[in-house]
């Protein structure tokens, strides 16, 4: 199985070297917001590999390590000699200081450990251009710079950090001890914009329009006269991929809609009517519900569920593809966040992603992932640019394994039906309350827990349904949605009264992190 993804070699970009910060994806996202493409790269990247990538700038992210400890994340020192502008953030500043001859010590030893918002005072610098001399920033460091390298100057201080910003403007190397990527740093976006546009001299012309042109060209070059299969779920990601591919290769695209019996209420009909009818996509419907549910019988481990569904999904494709000629490629709606969350050099894999870790090694297709460099909100912007209507572009995210990962424990028809019906009620009431565009994602989960209840004159022992609703910008971090109590109450009353085998509703008030969006 080979993987053909977006070719960004010729795109002006700033790379972010990943040192394990919880915020490193936000750095990339903020740079893109400025109009410059940005992506994460391993901190193990060599200077020669950086030359091949040819970025206009490099950002060294924060991280949990201490530069003076054995085994801490390092950098190829030749990168500092490439002449490419560099910005070190937090650990990144400490690392460049350490490698270039300065001194870093535990902040407790220097008496200047800082966590939380602080006031930065800076002197004139291209990095701080058009920002106030005093500004609020977020500090989060247990170590501190006590001596700066030769030819560097101090440009920023705080009450507890004598070297909050340093630079060598002749070599275009900058370091800041705070985190400009988080919103707690009030002028953080301005600082990143100064680095990207003024110091790196980026044009700032990255846009979805450019992305469409680039991807269409790349898809046509890759596919040639062969045919492409797309697994169409009806969700935002696969729908956008479908419209993009059709724009690129027309009738060479064959969409296979696999009804695996794990869809939301009425979803199968919506997919066929909306994408097959309105947009004219060539859709083959595979009714495979019994096949999937038979394979999932007795399985309760979430990772095993994902693997089974991933394997069966592709095997269904194999069955359908065997009926077709000249099919060489399989398209997927994998996003950048999917790739990141499935593990990097600096982080453990939290859970295999359904678009990354569930594919069998003997798959007969080459893989095309046109969206795997985009965040979720960028995919929505891409859909709008492609002329797709809001009710598709702003549709709720839905995982590839479907309701299988919204049913805790073993999957049964009874459990699936409780989730289908309760989810339909939730979506209906959220829309009635005018909250459907304010809440990033919302759904129900059958927790697998039964509890005692009283309905009418009788005792019940039925399922507990959890409501999960979050607000987010890009899916990397999220907070639980503050749904008005009267709306929650109405949802709860309707579910208990209208959905069989349910007698209790709970609301998930956990943010991401520590929790993930989905329960499995």
From Swiss-Prot:
| Residue positions of the active site | 90 (nucleophile), 179, 181
Q: Which UniProt keywords apply?
A: ATP-binding, Glutamine amidotransferase, GMP biosynthesis, Ligase, Nucleotide-binding, Purine biosynthesis
Task: Give the Pfam families listed for this entry.
Answer: GATase, GMP_synt_C, NAD_synthase
Pathway given for this chain reads: Purine metabolism; GMP biosynthesis; GMP from XMP (L-Gln route): step 1/1
- Taking every annotated instance into account, which residue ranges of this chain make up the domain GMPS ATP-PPase? 206-395
Give me the residues that bind ATP, please: 233-239
Q: Write the protein's name.
A: GMP synthase [glutamine-hydrolyzing]
- Which organism's genome codes for this protein? Streptococcus pneumoniae (strain P1031)
